[in-house]
Amino acid sequence: MAKKSKQLRAALEKIDSTKAYSVEEAVALAKETNFAKFDATVEVAYNLNIDVKKADQQIRGAMVLPNGTGKTSRVLVFARGAKAEEAKAAGADFVGEDDLVAKINDGWLDFDVVIATPDMMALVGRLGRVLGPRNLMPNPKTGTVTMDVAKAVEESKGGKITYRADRAGNVQAIIGKVSFEADKLVENFKAFNDTIQKAKPATAKGTYVTNLTITTTQGVGIKVDVNSL
């Protein structure tokens, strides 16, 4: 514990808490100040000036990072017949119907993404209390309720991330791993930022991005200059 505190203090000394950094500077600092003994995840956290109580200001979606996330996602697909075969051929880790529902209801959760064809949603709906709180429930807005299961599986395996603004307008997302080259992390960030900027509601007033930080697992949040975006 003492060693960790010492590492945290050392990291804090390298970061000026009164300064807002460029994206390139923030990424470099995130890599430099990371003290986790594993390949830590690099994340971004936005605070958006939106009112999610208004239907037209809810932000939710998905995108594929150009350089992936550095994480191999375990993909589960609810499908039958030809669509089930397509999912398997595309690399889905688990494909099924009632058998998977029973398994999940028994406590099994060894998967990261859930995809379903539209006709399976009545069945998948039974798992709402389990999947919903874990943000695993398939949704058309994130491309996880679809007839094109092969594409959905391939994207999920190839760096697809989902995002959603919470009640306070906060949006968090993974942009890669500490082991990534800095320019790859910057490229991923810029791709995600473009997505967030394009998602700005037409009715949102004032400054859209009010705060933005980049951090690593167990790391220190590094403030990014929103005016540089």
Swiss-Prot record:
Task: Give the GO molecular function terms.
Answer: rRNA binding; structural constituent of ribosome; tRNA binding
What does this protein do, in the record's words? Binds directly to 23S rRNA. The L1 stalk is quite mobile in the ribosome, and is involved in E site tRNA release.
Q: Which family does it belong to?
A: Belongs to the universal ribosomal protein uL1 family.
Q: Which NCBIfam families match?
A: rplA_bact
Gene3D superfamilies listed in its UniProt record: 3.30.190.20, 3.40.50.790
Q: What is this protein called?
A: Large ribosomal subunit protein uL1
Relate the assembly described in the record: Part of the 50S ribosomal subunit.
Q: Name one GO biological process term.
A: translation
Q: Which HAMAP family match?
A: Ribosomal_uL1_B
Matching entries from InterPro entries are given as: Ribosom_uL1_bac-type (IPR005878), Ribosomal_uL1 (IPR002143), Ribosomal_uL1-like (IPR023674), Ribosomal_uL1/biogenesis (IPR028364), Ribosomal_uL1_3-a/b-sand (IPR016095), Ribosomal_uL1_CS (IPR023673)
Q: Which gene encodes it?
A: rplA
Keyword Transcription regulation attached: no
